A protein has these predicted regions:
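Glycine-rich loop(s) and the adjacent beta-strand/alpha-helix scaffold that form part
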Residues: 1-44, 189-206
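Short glycine-/small-residue-rich flexible loop motifs, especially phosphate/cofactor-binding loops
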Residues: 15, 128-129, 318
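Proline- and acidic/polar-enriched loop/turn elements at helix boundaries
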Residues: 30-31, 144, 333
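Glycine- and aromatic-enriched mobile tails/lids
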Residues: 55, 62-71, 75-80, 90, ...
């Protein structure tokens, strides 16, 4: 996604690699977006601020027209609505032209009791320090409003596993954010840390047990040579799109068409565009010809996998014709009890994505 709290090196490779290996994936449409992230400077765009509850009990959100717009989205919980609701509200206000001139919303903590600000600053010291650096000490001390935008944050969907982290491929284990189904359609704050502790331990124990009884398979030399040849393709291409440009096109497409607010038409357009990007992937050109420490070659390899992961997300989002948790369809805005099911993706004999609902 073009706006994300994650580091640039986190490109979703695990989902695509597991799919290629024959593993099933579950609920890939469940992508979490946080309501508050830094809009500027460009080097910090999308970086985590968090949620409204971190800025006092009387925090308020305003659009560029001075409206407290959460009255429209959740008049009872207002700024303390769940993160998906507030992120969607922030996105909608900006998308429909009611944001500030910088296409942001305003977080206003000024009606809080400022004697409490120290307690809150301790709870999220890094974010408060970054707010002070970006917007000034007054914003960090609840004396002035500051700007924010929503940002992609986490994947609830992922590789389908059992309680011992086994996938549907023999001896392939998975845990953490690469796995899916642990958090359902939404994730509570802090549970990702619990997840990696619990399932990381289970995966490690199961891997050790498998290793004791499973002989190591030898990789055929020709497979290794073929993999090396694939990495050379991008150095030999002369006229292709630079991988960085291709990546930007993909990320913008995902934000615009498979982002916080989705629709059937947008998802169809996204899948067609992703098919074009997939055909283009082998033709991207690393202009840097160095064979070592070549960032462009790495980006070219990552791009192929990013496109595949993006197709998995868009395919699953198109299949789920309802809104649930982090997945919101403006053409199906209500939660449908009949959809209390999982979308399962797997690789078909023609390498295409097979969809099942269970």
């Amino acid at each position: 996604y073009s706006t994300s709290t994650n580091a640039q090196c986190l490109t979703g490779d695990g989902y695509a690699l597991a799919f290629d290996a024959g593993a099933e994936l579950v609920d890939m449409e469940m992508v979490q977006f946080l309501p508050l992230a830094f809009p500027r400077p460009s080097t910090m765009r999308g970086q985590l601020i968090g949620m409204c509850s971190l800025f006092g009990p009387n925090v308020k959100l305003y659009n560029g027209l001075g409206e407290r717009y959460m009255l429209r989205y959740d008049p009872e919980k207002l700024e303390y609505a769940t993160r998906d609701v507030v992120a969607r509200a922030n996105y909608t206000e900006i998308q429909e032209g009611r944001g500030t001139r910088r296409k942001t919303i305003l977080v206003d903590p000024t009606e809080n009791d400022r004697s409490c600000v120290g307690t809150y600053r301790v709870s999220l010291a890094v974010a408060y320090d970054m707010i002070a650096e970006t917007f000034g000490e007054k914003a960090a001390n609840w004396e002035a409003a500051f700007e924010a935008i929503p940002s992609q944050h986490f994947m609830m969907g992922g590789v389908r596993i059992d309680e011992d982290c086994r996938t549907t491929v023999a001896n392939l284990l998975c845990c953490g954010e690469a796995s899916g189904g642990v958090h359902g359609a939404n994730r509570l704050a802090g549970n990702a840390l619990t997840e990696i502790l619990v399932f990381g331990k289970r995966a490690g124990r199961k891997a050790a047990a498998i290793a004791r009884t499973t002989p190591v398979k030898q990789i055929h030399p020709e497979m290794a040579r073929a993999a090396v040849r694939q990495t050379q393709v991008y150095l030999n291409n002369q006229d292709g799109v630079p991988p960085g440009h291709a990546r930007q096109r993909l990320q913008t497409l995902m934000w615009d068409k498979v982002g916080i607010v989705r629709s059937g038409d947008d998802l169809e357009q996204a899948l067609k565009a992703l098919s074009r990007l997939e055909r283009m992937a082998d033709g991207v050109a690393a202009r840097c010809r160095m064979r070592h420490w070549n960032r462009e070659r790495l980006e070219a390899l990552e791009f192929r996998l990013m496109v595949k992961t993006a197709k998995l997300i868009a395919t699953s989002a198109r299949e789920r014709t309802e809104s649930r948790g982090s997945h919101y369809r403006r053409d199906f805005p209500e939660t449908d009890p009949a959809w209390r099911r999982n979308v399962i993706l797997s690789k078909g004999s023609d390498n295409e994505i097979k969809v099942a609902v269970a």
